[in-house]
């Protein structure tokens, strides 16, 4: 299994890209996953009183590093593009400690266009 990452603004074309790529059974783009949050919460355990009482950082790092394999264990695709908030500073730092050279797909759509697309779908039909 090979995991890469999709980080883009909402309404930038993530769903369209995912629906095109997901036509290939060997390649899957996820919906917005909770994996980034799972790994972040595991990382926060390093500040927990129970952990600090017996700081076995190596074992906790093993759990964190195996999160990707465990989360995607039942996925049949060889390549997975995880769509989540991996570009935030804390998530990116943790991700780089797990995967040395993570690869990102970033869809570039001007932020004002993304915002305008929200307004367009929320506008009353009258």
Task: Name the predicted role of every residue range.
Residues 44, 79-126:
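PAPS-dependent sulfotransferase catalytic domain
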Residues 73-74, 101:
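Residue-level detector of alpha-helix boundary/anchor positions
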Residues 18, 69, 92-96:
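Short amphipathic alpha-helical segments and helix-helix/interface helices
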Residues 1-68, 74-75:
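PAPS-dependent sulfotransferase catalytic core
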């Amino acid at each position: 299994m090979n995991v890469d990452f999709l980080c883009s603004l909402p309404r930038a074309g993530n769903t369209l890209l995912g629906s095109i790529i997901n036509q290939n059974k060997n390649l899957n783009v996820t919906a917005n996953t909770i994996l980034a949050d799972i790994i972040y919460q595991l990382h926060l355990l390093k500040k927990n009183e129970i952990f600090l009482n017996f700081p076995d950082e190596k074992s906790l790092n093993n759990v964190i590093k195996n999160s990707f394999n465990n989360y995607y264990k039942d996925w049949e695709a060889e390549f997975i593009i995880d769509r989540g908030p991996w570009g935030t500073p804390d998530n990116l730092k943790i991700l780089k400690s797990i995967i040395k050279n993570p690869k990102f797909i970033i869809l570039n759509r001007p932020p004002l266009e993304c915002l305008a697309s929200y307004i367009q779908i929320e506008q009353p039909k009258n």
